[in-house]
Amino acid sequence: MKLAELVGDDLPVDRVHGFLREIVAPLTLADAERVPLFEALGRVLAQDIVSPVSVPPHDNSAMDGYAFDGALLDADAAPDAALSLRIAGTALAGTCWQGSLAPGDAVRIMTGAVMPAGLDTVVPQEFCTVDGDSVRFPMRALRPGANRRRAGEDLLQGEAALRRGERLSPAALGLVASLGLPTVPVWRRLRVAYFSTGEEILNMGDAPREGAVYDSNRYTVFGLLQRLGCEVIDLGLVRDDPATLE
């Protein structure tokens, strides 16, 4: 279509929108690419991100404290009643405690450490008094299951962590990294060419002249396109002439 045929006597905005919809081809999966996480900020997902693991992957402690069996708590205990337990060992983050437990035992546990089998509650260390190999704390300080993060509490294996069409934020990058995924499928950047036109427009560095203004809109459009993550092609300042514009 020739420019003159497009313009006619006038050019309403809705006509421009219709023309653009006719000539712009929508992206397909052939236009998707995989990029490393360090290059993915601001890009748009071409496919859902499905979690290959549960997050967290195991029951773990939300506090530094002592893990124990919550069934030992008595909801009807007197306000000043305390529970005293033997400390059977220490569970560190990044390892699985392999010790053995007797009824009434507790395990010193760090934030993020895997909950020892058979223990489901963590009392924060601030509530505890330690005497040798025993720990004592008020029963009313917590309820069974307190301060325990369950496996899959944030995200279950096979669940969609992020949806196609989402723009990747810093938080989204962290979420993908927590799944152990080094790359993400994103749409290629939209390629957008633009220019300024008008005999009254001056380029940066031109000497001022009466009736003319410096080209500011081009830089505004450049900033908007860059912020949207587009691949920007600046065609510069084009003469206000139909043949040149063609």
Provide a role label for each language-model segment.
Residues 17-21, 41, 88, 125, ...:
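A generic alpha-helix structural signal
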